[in-house]
Amino acid sequence: MPSDRPFKQRRSFADRCKEVQQIRDQHPSKIPVIIERYKGEKQLPVLDKTKFLVPDHVNMSELVKIIRRRLQLNPTQAFFLLVNQHSMVSVSTPIADIYEQEKDEDGFLYMVYASQETFGF
């Protein structure tokens, strides 16, 4: 079971930077992404892991499908994937473009997921 603490609190900045460098050296066509459940989320389950290496050609709609499948959600369950806890990006946007615009200073791309109700829509 993953820790309740966010990834950034479990690893030092230096360790995260080093890990990204190793990932990018070994897998230059993969984007290092951290996906965690939104802190106030109650309806959606917790993912079995938080770190993903996403092929750079994948777009957001494909990533959403992958995460929905990992969470074993049914088609009617609301699901939102936000970049840096605030940005909803177009589902057609390639993950490589999002990475270039939104990556953290440690080199990871951070995302959170939540159900629609969490944001009061």
Curated annotation (Swiss-Prot):
It comes from Homo sapiens. Residues 121 form a propeptide. Keywords: Autophagy, Cytoplasm, Cytoplasmic vesicle, Cytoskeleton, Lipoprotein, Membrane, Microtubule, Phosphoprotein, Ubl conjugation pathway. Changing residue 120 to A: No processing of precursor. Changing residue 30 to R: Enhances binding to RETREG1. Disulfide bonds: none annotated. The keyword DNA-binding does not apply. Changing residue 53 to A: Decreases interaction with ATG13. Coiled coil: none annotated. The precursor molecule is cleaved by ATG4 (ATG4A, ATG4B, ATG4C or ATG4D) to expose the glycine at the C-terminus and form the cytosolic form, LC3-I. The processed form is then activated by APG7L/ATG7, transferred to ATG3 and conjugated to phosphatidylethanolamine (PE) phospholipid to form the membrane-bound form, LC3-II. During non-canonical autophagy, the processed form is conjugated to phosphatidylserine (PS) phospholipid. ATG4 proteins also mediate the delipidation of PE-conjugated forms. (Microbial infection) The Legionella effector RavZ is a deconjugating enzyme that hydrolyzes the amide bond between the C-terminal glycine residue and an adjacent aromatic residue in ATG8 proteins conjugated to phosphatidylethanolamine (PE), producing an ATG8 protein that is resistant to reconjugation by the host machinery due to the cleavage of the reactive C-terminal glycine. RavZ is also able to mediate delipidation of ATG8 proteins conjugated to phosphatidylserine (PS). GO terms for biological process: autophagosome assembly; autophagosome maturation; autophagy of mitochondrion; cellular response to amino acid starvation; cellular response to copper ion; cellular response to hydrogen peroxide; cellular response to nitrogen starvation; cellular response to oxygen-glucose deprivation. Changing residue 49 to A: Increases interaction with ATG13 and strongly reduces autophagosome formation. Residues 49-53 are annotated as: Important for interaction with ATG13 and for autophagosome formation. The modification Phosphoserine is found at residue 12. The keyword Protein transport does not apply. Belongs to the ATG8 family. Most abundant in heart, brain, liver, skeletal muscle and testis but absent in thymus and peripheral blood leukocytes. One of its GO terms (cellular component) is autophagosome. A lipid is attached at residue 120 (Phosphatidylethanolamine amidated glycine). Changing residue 27 to Y: Enhances binding to RETREG1. It is found in: Cytoplasmic vesicle, Autophagosome membrane; Endomembrane system; Cytoplasm, Cytoskeleton. This is Microtubule-associated protein 1 light chain 3 alpha. A lipid is attached at residue 120 (Phosphatidylserine amidated glycine). The lineage of its organism: Eukaryota, Metazoa, Chordata, Craniata, Vertebrata. Ubiquitin-like modifier involved in formation of autophagosomal vacuoles (autophagosomes). While LC3s are involved in elongation of the phagophore membrane, the GABARAP/GATE-16 subfamily is essential for a later stage in autophagosome maturation. Through its interaction with the reticulophagy receptor TEX264, participates in the remodeling of subdomains of the endoplasmic reticulum into autophagosomes upon nutrient stress, which then fuse with lysosomes for endoplasmic reticulum turnover. The record marks 120-121 as: Cleavage. One of its GO terms (molecular function) is phosphatidylethanolamine binding. It is a lipid-anchor.
